[in-house]
From Swiss-Prot:
The lineage of its organism: Bacteria, Pseudomonadati, Pseudomonadota, Gammaproteobacteria, Cellvibrionales. GO terms for molecular function: arginine-tRNA ligase activity; ATP binding. Keywords: Aminoacyl-tRNA synthetase, ATP-binding, Cytoplasm, Ligase, Nucleotide-binding, Protein biosynthesis. This is Arginine--tRNA ligase. Its EC number is 6.1.1.19. A motif ('HIGH' region) lies at residues 123-133. It comes from Saccharophagus degradans (strain 2-40 / ATCC 43961 / DSM 17024). It catalyses: tRNA(Arg) + L-arginine + ATP = L-arginyl-tRNA(Arg) + AMP + diphosphate. GO terms for cellular component: cytoplasm. It is an enzyme of class 6 (ligase). It holds the Pfam family DALR_1. Belongs to the class-I aminoacyl-tRNA synthetase family.
Amino acid sequence: MNIRNLLNDRVKSAMNDAGIPADYSPHLAVSKKAGFGDYQANGAMGAAKALKTNPREVAQKIIDNLDLNGIASKVEIAGPGFINIHLDPKWLAQQTVAVTNSTNLGILPKNNPETVVIDYSSPNLAKEMHVGHLRSTIIGDAIARVLEFTGDKVIRQNHVGDWGTQFGMLIAELEDQLGSGERPELALQDLEGFYQQAKKHFDDDPAFADRARDYVVKLQSGDAQVNKLWQEFRRVSLLHAEEIYRKLNVTLGEADVRGESAYNDDLAPVVAELEAQGLAVEDQGAKVVFLHELADKNGDPSVAIIQKKDGGYLYSTSDLAALRYRVGTLKANRILYFIDARQSLHMQQVFTLARKAGFADEWLSTEHHAFGTMLGSDGKPFKTRSGGTVKLAQLLDEAVERAAKEVRTKNPDLTEEEMAEVASKVGIGAVKYADLCKTRTNDYVFNWESMLAFEGNTGPYMQYAYTRIRSIFRRANENMDTFESEVNLTEPQEVQLAIKLLQLPEIVEQIAADAYPHVMCNYLYDLASLFMTFYEACPILKEGVEPAVKTSRLQLSKGVARTLAQGLDLLGIEVMEKM
């Protein structure tokens, strides 16, 4: 049950009955100031301007036709024509019981679910995953979870970099190490070191470099032995990535991997088709497309190179092939790409060219959801102290170690097994939440102290709020999972908490449309903060609290806990019974 949509539909119907043209919107939103109702409809002003009449008169006509019987306790006009809607506590109480006892917390599946392809993570298999891969991986995964929760069919695509000239060098190095008796898993246990060693041999040994270049040709022509070595390198590299995904609690699996190599046979046909349509032309030996739709301020067209002078293909070619596959084979209605902001022009070129070539229909939604960079305290891209790339595995291990110290200080009574579980969930959750709570398009500064804090808008604070409610139920000798009670909202803190609790469907709907996970973080923080205020003002377990009041407040608390757990789960963050 989506309160905003319900009220919007009722106000829209009232506007129609009041004779207001259908193209005017109710402009319904959550009220930002206390005393101005719980929701506010601001459409009267725009309609009045067009109708050349007094906005308060228009607002009154809307109210005269507005049916919110049993939903609102009061509807009033404020200022120049704002319509303030005060929700009825009795109705809120009924909705709270229904929602907190429902399977999906009142979120109904879509009437018309879409097939959504999401391209995210997509590391280069030649190297270990580093912090630069974190944002795409966890933001993309959060949106995949949200869209599945709404009922969409989500197809994850991990477009890994498993092809290219560097693989000749890596295969030659792997062959040398296997020839000396090394097992693939051991040879590649340090992917970064392996890459550096291969690069050194390539730079220092002309014979090795010649063999590496020869292997590129053989790999591209389908040589069985070289292909076998490449498959082995790819297999072990993917195991590295899958271990990171497991630590991060990310839903990507082996079945979601469809790398650049999957499109090898499609590249030449894509170029040929673009040439046949007159879109691709030869320019200085290369094959390019001039995109006047993306012209610069001087009117010069944007140039997309689809085949190099030496016959090699580029990312734009494989991305076009991938997009055509996602439309033609996967039958996508919507395609989302989580790739950093530096690739914005590239993605615009791919989308524009795909439509010009007929690979994607005009109605298809192709969306590049860009993101900023993780920065160090110096304001520069996050690096090691020596200036090297920070490996993601090392970052996550350090997060768990730091979390263990914090948790051990706060709760030394935990068993070693409990400590390990809590430290893992708190540490990984802290890293993910610190990233996801920032507006996706902004850069942000990585800071251990703030992300592991147990107060403020942090992962540990959200997890703590959940465990605190679990603790309340244990002290009440009640099983939260099976507990059910009527709700009676008499105190303002109860009413405000119930309203916030019931707004989850609005939040999920917004994230599904805009792909900004920080909206969920802000919502959960507001919910947790309102719960703490409610808990201080409205006793639950104190002596003298009437049984009906106690059970009502326990039911409200259960709703908060379930919403916190669900919201965090949609972000890929786990909760625990105690911490």
